[in-house]
């Protein structure tokens, strides 16, 4: 990751402080591949448990639970990429950014099952009648399930009055003066904006990075299918699929940029959620002919 080696030192933050840059004749100097830029660190710990059953009596399933804690001081937009990274608030103190990673999903339960219904030829019930077998035999049902806690986020100020001249891909954190977690949070207000205050100009905020958590995610996808033998190598598969079967609302992250009133106070109502992580329930019926 690149680091701005020309950021104004903390001891010299002031209005019109271009002359206090280490190299005042230049603006932001983002340098990668040097020792100062290689101080991004991460730490991951997890506990994983899985229960499985291979196909037996028509049933196959696998369910897993993962508890994990992922900490770092810098994140990118995705695994194996440097793009989209939000730079350290203070380039001279990267450790101040050490906290929950953007990818720190603390609890995750995932699983699937496939069950061949016990009806029709070769099955336990109603296995002697070819007409009955043609109607209700050979059906199988499958399901995937995901339940996981939300992703972390950081409340940030709308403008930068730190005078650090940090450039782009940078966030100025507020001061945390109270508990930002609401007992009754919702899509119209996810966290307590009154728990934050604008930092004094020329200073950095004391809020810890990624101390807030977004909405949890829950979704179940169900499929029901059967393959009909039409003639020799000609087969017809009929299936019905329901994504987000129970139509459970799973919302995206709230807006995290705070609003400031004309008096300089943090305004309420900025932590609104206007997106979903999982679309509402969709259902479809399809057929596939192979020969």
Regions found by a protein language model. Name each.
Residues 1-291:
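Short, solvent-exposed micro-motifs at the edges of structured domains
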């Amino acid at each position: 990751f690149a680091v701005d080696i020309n950021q104004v030192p903390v001891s010299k933050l002031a209005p019109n402080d271009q002359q206090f840059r280490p190299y005042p004749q230049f603006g932001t100097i983002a340098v990668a591949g040097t020792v100062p830029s290689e101080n991004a660190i991460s730490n991951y710990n997890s506990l994983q448990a899985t229960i499985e059953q291979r196909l037996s009596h028509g049933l196959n399933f696998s369910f897993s639970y993962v508890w994990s804690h992922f900490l770092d001081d810098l994140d990118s937009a995705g695994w194996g990429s440097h793009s989209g990274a939000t730079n350290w608030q203070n380039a001279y103190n990267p450790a101040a950014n050490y906290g929950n990673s953007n990818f720190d999903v603390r609890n995750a339960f995932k699983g699937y099952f496939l069950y061949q219904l016990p009806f029709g030829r070769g099955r336990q019930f109603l296995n002697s009648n070819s007409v009955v077998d043609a109607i209700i035999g050979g059906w199988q049902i499958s399901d995937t399930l995901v339940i996981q806690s939300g992703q972390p986020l950081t409340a940030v100020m709308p403008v930068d009055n730190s005078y650090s001249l940090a450039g782009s891909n940078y966030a100025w954190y507020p001061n945390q003066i109270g508990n930002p977690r609401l007992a009754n949070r919702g899509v119209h207000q996810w966290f307590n904006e009154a728990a934050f205050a604008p930092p004094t100009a020329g200073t950095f905020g004391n809020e810890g990075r990624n101390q807030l958590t977004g909405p949890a995610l829950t979704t179940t996808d169900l499929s029901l299918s059967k393959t009909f033998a039409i003639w020799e190598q000609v087969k017809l598969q009929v299936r019905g699929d329901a994504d987000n079967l129970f139509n459970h609302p799973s919302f995206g992250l709230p807006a995290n940029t705070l609003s400031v009133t004309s008096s300089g106070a943090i305004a309420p109502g900025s932590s609104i959620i206007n997106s979903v992580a999982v679309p509402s329930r969709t259902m479809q019926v399809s057929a596939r002919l192979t020969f």
